């Protein structure tokens, strides 16, 4: 049985603009999870963890990526390989598995593993937001770094890190040693994608970049202009690879959306990393 416990009645409703939404909240292992269904005729849900938006899932069309940073992640994937070509993907951090569903819908032959530390959250998502049964998509309830450290070399085309605990990525997933391990797990032309929440002067991003620039040959940063110019807090997506990233293609793709993304190349990423050094496992970043 799912370990989730509803704490708000399933028919509780709230008005949001001209829409009426259905809210249902649950206690899970690491947070209070709230599912918000838009009453638009579609089976579209937003997952909030402790009141913060975590994932958006449209069960009728998993190709719809409503959160801009998740769309940028999908954009990078779509620039890496022709439509339909499998991209075996390891997801460090699960949420409602928006990106994994997108990959399953657009590249159904891809093998994917989603690692989520919160077992009750996985139960909730499996029950309330079910995905099409397939052996190509597996969930593992475990510590993401521990799974990464046990993954065989060259097992994946893509590794995606989108894991947060108390508003921050776990330290064990931010270290130089973690980046080195990701590089080992990736195939030679593989790509590591990292979601960072930050604002100017980009201290968190600088630490991430210091590690990734030391490990990978090419690194780029994607965000919206208002964030990059220091006007507000927001998401930054970092792409790192030993292959040359298709910067021009990614730039065109991320600029074509509701919120136009901008790409900073390796040279600009290096400038963002100045004054920062990589975190090490010995400093408290080990999965232990």
Describe these PLM feature segments.
Residues 52-56, 164-167, 192, 199:
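A short, flexible beta-alpha/helix-coil linker loop
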